[in-house]
């Protein structure tokens, strides 16, 4: 259990460091760079940040609810995340608002991860009839998901600057 808690403390610290670093680098980017889509099927930087806000809000519910119950049945939005981004119109939102919401939501998640009740780490989210994920795995994987999308944003910004 001690190893898992140390791992999660490291995850929380990395989330905070990544968020602060990215927010500092991206705060002053112009809208034409932020709305650039490398192809018609790709998201812009604004849309990726919007998706990460959706991810944070869904994971916030999971992280808290899984400390209240041993097994959680909660919908997975993954199959609909393109629609989530479209419905919320992230492409046309003010950048300062998106970046701020993303930053603060992740600071909140890092704090939840850091202070999780160790006795709840094996509580499970029931994805479907056959698949479950523990709270520990959800929290640890959140960092990987964040890193993947920050890499996506880095590539999108490079393409926008080369365009």
Sequence positions of predicted segments:
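Extreme N-terminal tail/first-helix region
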Residues: 1-21, 158
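Acidic/His metal-coordination segments adjacent to aromatic residues that form catalytic metal sites
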Residues: 4-7, 45, 83-97, 129-137
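Acidic/histidine-rich alpha-helical segments that form the ligand environment
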Residues: 15-18, 25, 83-122, 142
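Short amphipathic alpha-helical segments
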Residues: 16-23, 46, 60
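N-terminal first-folded block
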Residues: 21, 25-34
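Short, contiguous alpha-helical
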Residues: 35-81, 110, 124-163
